[in-house]
Amino acid sequence: MEDTGIQRGIWDGDAKAVQQCLTDIFTSVYTTCDIPENAIFGPCVLSHTSLYDSIAFIALKSTDKRTVPYIFRVDTSAANGSSEGLMWLRLVQSARDKEEQNLEAYIKNGQLFYRSLRRIAKDEELLVWYGKELTELLLLCPSRSHNKMNGSSPYTCLECSQRFQFEFPYVAHLRFRCPKRLHSADISPQDEQGGGVGTKDHGGGGGGGKDQQQQQQEAPLGPGPKFCKAGPLHHYPSPSPESSNPSAAAGGSSAKPSTDFHNLARELENSRGGSSCSPAQSLSSGSGSGGGGGHQEAELSPDGIATGGGKGKRKFPEEAAEGGGGAGLVGGRGRFVERPLPASKEDLVCTPQQYRASGSYFGLEENGRLFAPPSPETGEAKRSAFVEVKKAARAASLQEEGTADGAGVASEDQDAGGGGGSSTPAAASPVGAEKLLAPRPGGPLPSRLEGGSPARGSAFTSVPQLGSAGSTSGGGGTGAGAAGGAGGGQGAASDERKSAFSQPARSFSQLSPLVLGQKLGALEPCHPADGVGPTRLYPAAADPLAVKLQGAADLNGGCGSLPSGGGGLPKQSPFLYATAFWPKSSAAAAAAAAAAAAGPLQLQLPSALTLLPPSFTSLCLPAQNWCAKCNASFRMTSDLVYHMRSHHKKEYAMEPLVKRRREEKLKCPICNESFRERHHLSRHMTSHN
């Protein structure tokens, strides 16, 4: 890797992401079959937990010299279109220029897909780069103006004088990797209102589309240090665990910004709904909600550009007070107030499998059109998650303008209750302090989920954390923008499909043992004869009794052979215990194996109300008083008799053939005496001993 001066802010705390990135860098992907033109692969699995795990990973891998010791051969025709995504897409190398590029990355349904640009022959390496829309979104602008300005064929960085032979590594270096550019973005002052790249045009948020698009493309190539502010590329931790936008505090916060691709792509999705605004206009008029206050001009934060802001400081307090002090102040607010709602809200709502054929999707450049053709089943539950937020944000913006002061109140950042499921916190306001109490991780899902239907709309819904207490919180804590009812969603009704911009699920170590047992019960198929110890399945459980109770709960919940599947049992009952792991006598085990081989047994679950607790001292002794029907063991024979009368007296008679076969099997091998029940034979065998 040639860029050794990458800021440590990217690497700190991201060891796993870095390891994944290194694995991706040193692996190339070759296809084992021919790929036709316009073939679609994806979605690419991204958790968006770091810069390396976002849509920027393609640019971060781009280098002039490739060192690829590992070759990954993929049958690209197999398993295409699965909802889980294709893991090998992360391993595809970045193209260095347009000549060698054969795959194009684009966003559909908020997820990252690859599309073949031409016919790719067998045993050819797959090389990907961003499509036109993502190139504009990430400000990976073409280098034509650079060539005109310099007149030299190699690409040279004007800041660090590093030379590149290929175009794509050069623009990736400018956008993400140049250490001097990143450093100057940190230390540069917040003035330079007049200089730089079209600050007033961008700040207005509604100027000429062509001029803005031209300035947007030329911005990263400006020779001055002004455009260096466009590159806050360090992945700094947020000031608050509830904040998705680190630079949310108004009036002098020194928090460093981070590139929030989540809000960028959400805004891109939002802008598709309006047929009157071009991509450049929609991006430049408020798409910078992801990192207010000197965030990148790439993200076109109107306040950061109009004020030339460096670190969340507001040059004009009256504008900060009017807009709420957060990201997307003037342009974003103006756009949502003045622009009419789109006629069709059904944007970005097709599944990856639904439209696989070539030509069945719409490009982002097709002004204001849907990403996919509307399907007949596209209904209320499948629409975008950000449609309701516009009305709520519009009402809340009129409310907030009278109450916010110049010191700064956090802007509701139009994705409140939607995209990240989080609010933009304020550092110096009681209103912001109330917003900080909103539980971000499980967070308020969009109002589309209130009906309990599976949300298959926008990909920007938060993935609920397992066992999160805040997963069903109301929309009141999501910020002022969601106060109109866009917040309260159920965590249980969330989409199963992974989003490229979703928050990651919480790890199992944060769950209580019983909750963990319930979550893993359906995942681990268990059978009484497996002999799998509960301590192996649940190593995190602290006390041994909890392990036994847990194992029993999951045994009853996971065994497919039980008729009711454990549905009628409270899984946290203290009288449920894992009898499958208790030791049995050898004769009883042999008889059990013989009976199991005879045919399917009709098992019946005991009722949790009358099941008697066992004595745990019997764990060290052979269990003699055990029920052959439900595998429960008892210390006293009277307890077993009571159990048999209360539980299995009304059991339906089995088929005659199976019954006769079972009676033949339950025969004493010493005296040839037959028994109807297995525990009778077991008790009889002890008399021979």
UniProtKB/Swiss-Prot annotation:
The keyword Acyltransferase does not apply. S-adenosyl-L-methionine binds at residue 130. A zinc finger (C2H2-type) spans 155-183, 625-648, 666-688. Probable histone methyltransferase, preferentially acting on 'Lys-9' of histone H3. Involved in the control of steroidogenesis through transcriptional repression of steroidogenesis marker genes such as CYP17A1 and LHCGR. Forms with BHLHE22 a transcriptional repressor complex controlling genes involved in neural development and neuronal differentiation. In the retina, it is required for rod bipolar and type 2 OFF-cone bipolar cell survival. Interacts with EPM2A and NHLRC1. This interaction sequesters EPM2A and NHLRC1 to the nucleus. Interacts with BHLHE22. Its EC number is 2.1.1.-. It comes from Homo sapiens. The gene is PRDM8. This is PR domain zinc finger protein 8. Belongs to the class V-like SAM-binding methyltransferase superfamily. Residues 193-210, 322-333, 472-491 have a biased composition (Gly residues). Its main location: nucleus. It is linked to Epilepsy, progressive myoclonic 10: A form of progressive myoclonic epilepsy, a clinically and genetically heterogeneous group of disorders defined by the combination of action and reflex myoclonus, other types of epileptic seizures, and progressive neurodegeneration and neurocognitive impairment. EPM10 is an autosomal recessive form characterized by progressive dysarthria, myoclonus, ataxia, cognitive decline, psychosis, dementia and spasticity, with onset in childhood. There is variability between patients. Residues 16-131 form the SET domain. One of its GO terms (cellular component) is nucleus.
